[in-house]
Structures are given as structure tokens and as C-alpha cells.
């Protein structure tokens, strides 16, 4: 009995990973307190980014996507494209429509639509997880206008980044479908198989506004925090005379905007473009946290999403490396 209690206490003890995470959090807190002026300035930059880019490019689409799913209009309008895409990825027309919206409008539109469809009983949990995994890419506006035209001063490169993001997302969806077919299918919640119908209700619009506001503000909070963290860490790297490549790699790991901006300033342009492609595929911890906040409410696993992101990172980098 004593030995069993000892083993239980040992199992319940502090794990090495918990210690590392605690030290990392304390380091980040100390860093922001020591360079509060820098942290404040980068927080302002993050808020400006939200006001000038995130809110205009995200909030209207969030409202419309909520309405498209709630009314059933999205599935009806996108049906001609959803059928072949659904066969390719092994998804229903409902989930395929969510993926299309995600590829057109960028994250988290597709993920939000997939989760709403699962919540309403139109899809099962496994299908929702795969739809979330292959629909979360940066928007065309961000890649073409911000990364291509602003950071690289080359809109064509922005278009190439967007195409590579779509292709890598589809590749990850195909591979996840292949993995699913190899495994034994688990019992899933029954889904609705009735044809898509369009239904409008007076309550749908205020509900869509409320949900879109909540999710958009949450995303802005993540963008602001990671912009502050990434900028403050970048100042430390500069004071230590660290390599610009190291700074660009770390920025790409944390947040896509700062990562692609830092990559564009690297002297080796071929490597810089490949790193930009990888940053687009990975999308940054900031986006992953945003996806976690969306999925956690419905107990959706992020494992397929993270696997897909690793595939997309490699695929985007490879496509850019081959074509540029």
C-alpha cells in the first residue's frame, strides 16, 4: 500500500515539461517588465494591426459566414464545388462547403463554419476535425496585399503564396482522409442527411453579430499578445547581436505577420522566400491558440489540425522552393 501511494505521489508530481513551461512564462513576464516601454510599443503595433487589417478583413466575413451556415444558404450555393471537393477529401457537402469558405476567406472562417455544422448535428466529430484541419489557411487579402505587396513588394509572390497555401491544405486533407480509411471507424454521432434547405429567421442576424463580435475580439487579443511577445523577444535578440535568421525563425514560430515580415528582410532572398512559405503553412502559435479557443468549446481535438499544419509547413516551403 505504501509503495502504491509513493508511485501515485510520484505520478502526481511536477513533470519536467511543467517546469520548463513555468520557467518560460516567468522569463516572458520578466522580459516584459524589464522592457515595458518596448512591450507597450509593440502592443500598440498589435492593436493597430487589428484595427487596420484584422477587423476589416475578418469581422464582416465572420458575420456573413455565420448567416450562411445558420440559414443553410452556404451549403446550397457552394453545392457544385462542394460535391467534387467532398469526394476528394472524404467529406460531406456540408463540411466541404466549410472548407471552401475557409480557403476563400482564410482562418478562422472555415473552422468556425465546420464547428457550427457539427454543433447543429449536420456532421460528426471526426469529419469536423478533418474539415477544421484543412480549411485554416491565411486569407488571400493578407497573403497578396500584406505579405506580397507590402513585405516583398511583389504581388505575384503573394499570389504564389496563396496558391501554395491552398494546394498544401488540400494535400493535408487528402492525407488525413487516407489515414482515416486505414483506421477502424469509431462510432460517431448520427448526422442529418436531409437536402440543404434555406431558412431565414429574425433572430439569426443579431445572433450572428454577437458571435462574430465575440470571436473577432478574441482573435484580436491573441494577435496583440503575440505581437507584444514577438517584438519584445526580437529586441533581446538584437541586443545580443543574434543572427537575423534566428530572429526570423522564432518570429515565424510565434506569429505569421511578424514572421513573414522578418523573413522578407533577410539578405539571402531564396532562403527568405522558402522561410516565408513555411511561415504561411505553419501560421504561428497565435493562430493555433485561436483555433484552440474555437475547438475547445465543442471538445474538438486539435491533433488532426496540428498534423495538417506540419504537412502544410513542409508542402508550402517545398512549393516555394521549387517555383522561386
Stretches found by the model and what they are:
Residues 73, 205-280:
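Transmembrane helical segments that form the transport core of multi-pass membrane transport proteins
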Amino acid at each position: 500500500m505504501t509503495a502504491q501511494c509513493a508511485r501515485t505521489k510520484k505520478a502526481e508530481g511536477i513533470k519536467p515539461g511543467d517546469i520548463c513551461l513555468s520557467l518560460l512564462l516567468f522569463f516572458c513576464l520578466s522580459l516584459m517588465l524589464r522592457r515595458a516601454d518596448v512591450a507597450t510599443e509593440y502592443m500598440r503595433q498589435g492593436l493597430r494591426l487589428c484595427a487596420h487589417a484584422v477587423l476589416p478583413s475578418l469581422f464582416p466575413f465572420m458575420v456573413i459566414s455565420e448567416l450562411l451556415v445558420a440559414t443553410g444558404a452556404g451549403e446550397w450555393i457552394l453545392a457544385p464545388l462542394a460535391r467534387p471537393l467532398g469526394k476528394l477529401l472524404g467529406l460531406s457537402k456540408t463540411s466541404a462547403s466549410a472548407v471552401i469558405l475557409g480557403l476563400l476567406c482564410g482562418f478562422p472562417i472555415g473552422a468556425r463554419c465546420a464547428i457550427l455544422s457539427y454543433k447543429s448535428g449536420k456532421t460528426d466529430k471526426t469529419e469536423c476535425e478533418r474539415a477544421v484541419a484543412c480549411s485554416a489557411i491565411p486569407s488571400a487579402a493578407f497573403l497578396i496585399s500584406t505579405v506580397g505587396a507590402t513585405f516583398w513588394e511583389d504581388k505575384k509572390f503573394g499570389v504564389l503564396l496563396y496558391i501554395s497555401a491552398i494546394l498544401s491544405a488540400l494535400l493535408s486533407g487528402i492525407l488525413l482522409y487516407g489515414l482515416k480509411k486505414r483506421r477502424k471507424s469509431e462510432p460517431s454521432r448520427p448526422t442529418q442527411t436531409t437536402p440543404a434547405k434555406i431558412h431565414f429567421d429574425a433572430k439569426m442576424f443579431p445572433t450572428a453579430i454577437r458571435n462574430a463580435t465575440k470571436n473577432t475580439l478574441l482573435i484580436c487579443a491573441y494577435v496583440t499578445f503575440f505581437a507584444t511577445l514577438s517584438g519584445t523577444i526580437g529586441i533581446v535578440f538584437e541586443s545580443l547581436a543574434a543572427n537575423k535568421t534566428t530572429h526570423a525563425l522564432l518570429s515565424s514560430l510565434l506569429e505569421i505577420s511578424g514572421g513573414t515580415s522578418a523573413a522578407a528582410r533577410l539578405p539571402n532572398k531564396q532562403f527568405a522566400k522558402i522561410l516565408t512559405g513555411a511561415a504561411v503553412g505553419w501560421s504561428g502559435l497565435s493562430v493555433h491558440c485561436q483555433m484552440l479557443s474555437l475547438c475547445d468549446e465543442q471538445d474538438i481535438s486539435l491533433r488532426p489540425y496540428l498534423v495538417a499544419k506540419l504537412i502544410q509547413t513542409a508542402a508550402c516551403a517545398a512549393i516555394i522552393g521549387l517555383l522561386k
